[in-house]
């Protein structure tokens, strides 16, 4: 079943006939009908691409640290890569459950070269802040369209992003304080849980194919 959302009158368009599109409703009778189309499914499809891109970037960061023989940092970002992949698949499942089309996009090549050990974490923090803004935009769009189900679904991601920004900020502070003594960072990560440790949270949305 397609989702139906109400938009402000200024966003309505009248048309004569034509095939029904995703996430719309027709009002009126006769040849002239009013069509209301939700913009949220397309925006969620776009966010799927952002989540996969984030996962791809975290793989590149993990490989960088692995090559530098920093196994704790590498393991942290391998977990982050899986987590972002899971987020993408949660969005996929949301669209599938809503009866919407899913368009899995390609992703741009990630950054693979870094000038120092802190740069990858700086990049990761900037990425998490960007994703937070993107999710906030989706929540606002759902609210504009009076899509209460979509807004409730997306609030989990907002909470998750707050935690991600906080944990990545903490990791960056540790890396910067350590300077060239990166074994101190390795020791810190071996003794302290920073971010999610791999298992999906109990209240996490279902992921298409199952979370890894």
Show the residue positions of the predicted features.
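Iron-associated oxidoreductase/ferritin-like identity signal
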Residues: 1-212
């Amino acid at each position: 079943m397609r989702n139906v959302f109400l938009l402000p009158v200024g966003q309505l368009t009248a048309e004569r006939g034509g095939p029904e599109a995703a996430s719309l409703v027709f009002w009126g009778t006769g040849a002239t009908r009013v069509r209301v189309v939700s913009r949220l499914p397309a925006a969620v499809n776009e966010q799927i691409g952002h989540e996969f891109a984030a996962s791809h970037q975290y793989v590149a960061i993990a490989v960088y640290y692995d090559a530098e023989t920093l196994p704790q940092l590498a393991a942290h970002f391998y977990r982050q890569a899986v987590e972002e992949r899971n987020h993408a698949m949660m969005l996929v499942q949301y669209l599938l459950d809503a009866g919407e089309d899913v368009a899995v996009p390609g992703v741009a090549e990630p950054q693979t070269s870094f000038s120092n050990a802190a740069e990858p974490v700086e990049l990761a923090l900037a990425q998490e802040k960007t994703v937070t803004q993107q999710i906030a935009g989706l929540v606002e769009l759902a609210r504009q369209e009076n899509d209460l189900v979509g807004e409730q679904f997306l609030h989990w991601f907002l909470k998750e992003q707050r935690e991600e920004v906080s944990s990545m900020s903490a990791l960056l502070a540790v890396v910067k304080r350590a300077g060239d003594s990166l074994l101190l960072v390795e020791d810190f990560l071996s003794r302290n849980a920073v971010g999610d440790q791999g298992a999906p949270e109990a209240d996490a949305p279902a992921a298409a194919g199952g979370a890894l």
